[in-house]
Amino acid sequence: MEAVIKVISSACKTYCGKTSPSKKEIGAMLSLLQKEGLLMSPSDLYSPGSWDPITAALSQRAMVLGKSGELKTWGLVLGALKAAREEQVTSEQAKFWLGLGGGRVSPPGPECIEKPATERRIDKGEEVGETTVQRDAKMAPEETATPKTVGTSCYHCGTAIGCNCATASAPPPPYVGSGLYPSLAGVGEQQGQGGDTPRGAEQPRAEPGHAGLAPGPALTDWARIREELASTGPPVVAMPVVIKTEGPAWTPLEPKLITRLADTVRTKGLRSPITMAEVEALMSSPLLPHDVTNLMRVILGPAPYALWMDAWGVQLQTVIAAATRDPRHPANGQGRGERTNLDRLKGLADGMVGNPQGQAALLRPGELVAITASALQAFREVARLAEPAGPWADITQGPSESFVDFANRLIKAVEGSDLPPSARAPVIIDCFRQKSQPDIQQLIRAAPSTLTTPGEIIKYVLDRQKIAPLTDQGIAAAMSSAIQPLVMAVVNRERDGQTGSGGRARRLCYTCGSPGHYQAQCPKKRKSGNSRERCQLCDGMGHNAKQCRRRDSNQGQRPGRGLSSGPWPVSEQPAVSLAMTMEHKDRPLVRVILTNTGSHPVKQRSVYITALLDSGADITIISEEDWPTDWPVVDTANPQIHGIGGGIPMRKSRDMIELGVINRDGSLERPLLLFPAVAMVRGSILGRDCLQGLGLRLTNL
């Protein structure tokens, strides 16, 4: 069918111009005609006897179904076939009158001259109409009756009626050919009957003024030739090899496609899905060894190209081994010709080295397919070796990283690993449960057991986050609403104790502990060198807080007086004050990462909490709600922290804790090592010891 489509398409382009149908439309029309039984084979379309039934059938189909696409295509094809037929008849007539011989139009016999082929009408009852049936059935030719004469004089004797010139010579028997060349349909029928002259025998040329026939053409049995070619199989030629009139010819690859692929490799890398898609698209059709090696030399660097050459050679050796075991392997040409070898597959055989035209002419279709498939597989192996993926076991979700970004990094690393495809989904789901943030882990643990794929887990987490977003801003808002009553209580107490001009609130003095003035205004202020100076920690005389020997043991106690005074009254100002102001109530809340540096085995080495920056607190206090239960704590000499509501029981971390503050942009401040206090408080507090160690101020937040 491909040959018929090409012939019809060429004729349509010649006689229809820009309105010629495409090969796809012609192929669809031929398939429909064969399906409807109007054509036994695509070559029957050349026969004029099948044109009228096709026109009638397609017209009826267009009226019933309302689809005129095939009818329009047939109209263009029919016009091209008629134009080609008329041009061929005219050419054959000219050859005859010039004495060149050959052609469809037979020379006039001694009896009469027939009408031109375009003026004859063929009746179903006449013997001439049987030529189509005889051609399709390929029956032996039979003698036909003398064709009807017309009302003109004979060419030889000039007699109008009753010419006996037909007995002057014996024409050869009629030729019954196939439908491959419609111009031969009727040759032999027009030459009359009788005679034993063999078919194809050369006839003597008739001299002017003498009776006799012009020599007929030397006919070739094209039907038998076509059958022999069909039995050997049509040649399969792969892109970029194209078929021209002189045979297969090599055409180079599109430079723009190669340039775009090289840019993709440089920007995206070899393992990128975009790169693999472009390589597979470019190598979707078989390529020559010349094109394959040049393509890889352009898109790969020197080292990856050397790796690719070795991998390609290994793949070609596998093909050769399979072809050696099976003589009818496609690379061996289905058993025709010599067996393939490594030199042929690499384009190094005689006549192929540096000669793409020679490779296109000498390589078999099966060899081209094997060459391209081996090159593509070698490219995949080089991509895995040259750009190995990061270890998926080391990927964890960052403090400020979204779950989608974490899932992207994890899935990309797992798919680029050497894990079998069946094990990738369970590994990804297990990493979601162990490597994500604690709040995400809680969501995944609470997920239904019916979620068995990574996509279902991701969708579930995103849906839950839309309902209850677990972000730093949400946690900060929750913390601020929880401690807002405490802040209001402190503000109200300060308002009740206002004195002095302008209603300025007077706080407790850090020197003497009395309300109503500041430390700078304290009348009991002593100079640093005075031996009568009172210690703010132990309330002793003769030294200050920096020189106090009980400084380490008294951390967490109120500086100054009151060690033996018991719990603080509620009406007095607490030592652990809340620095949160009403205008900026969410600013002192920060995200903190705590890491246990001890050797004690724990379930989690690091936890994320939200803490309040409090410049009025002496020490850092971690709430028992935030403190992991398996992190060890010890009792202290001073087991209480004095604050709002009196004393609060306190314990201290046995191991040193590394504390890091996470900024709003996700970066970490310089970590600090300390032994924080653990108490039953509403929220964790970062005191002055932490702020001084980190170099933070509330005004910097």
UniProtKB/Swiss-Prot annotation:
Keywords: Aspartyl protease, Capsid protein, Host nucleus, Hydrolase, Metal-binding, Protease, Repeat, Viral capsid assembly, Viral capsid maturation, Viral matrix protein, Viral release from host cell, Virion, Zinc, Zinc-finger
Site positions (Involved in capsid protein dimerization upon acidification): 418, 430
InterPro entries: Aspartic_peptidase_AS, Gag_M, Matrix_HIV/RSV_N, Peptidase_A2_cat, Peptidase_aspartic_dom_sf, Primate_lentivir_Gag_pol-like, Retropepsin-like_cat_dom, Retropepsins
CDD domains: HIV_retropepsin_like (cd05482)
Enzyme Commission number(s): 3.4.23.-
Enzyme class: hydrolase
Sequence motif Nuclear export signal, residues: 219-229
Zinc finger (CCHC-type): 507-524, 533-550
Motif (LYPX(n)L motif): 180-184
Region (Disordered): 128-150, 181-215, 544-571
Short sequence motif PPXY motif: positions: 172-175
Swiss-Prot/TrEMBL GO biological process terms: proteolysis; viral procapsid maturation; viral translational frameshifting
SMART domains named in the record: ZnF_C2HC
Entry text on domains: Capsid protein p27: Proton-driven dimerization of the C-terminus facilitates capsid assembly.
Protein name: Gag polyprotein
Organism of this sequence: Rous sarcoma virus subgroup B (strain Schmidt-Ruppin) (RSV-SR-B)
Lineage: Viruses, Riboviria, Pararnavirae, Artverviricota, Revtraviricetes
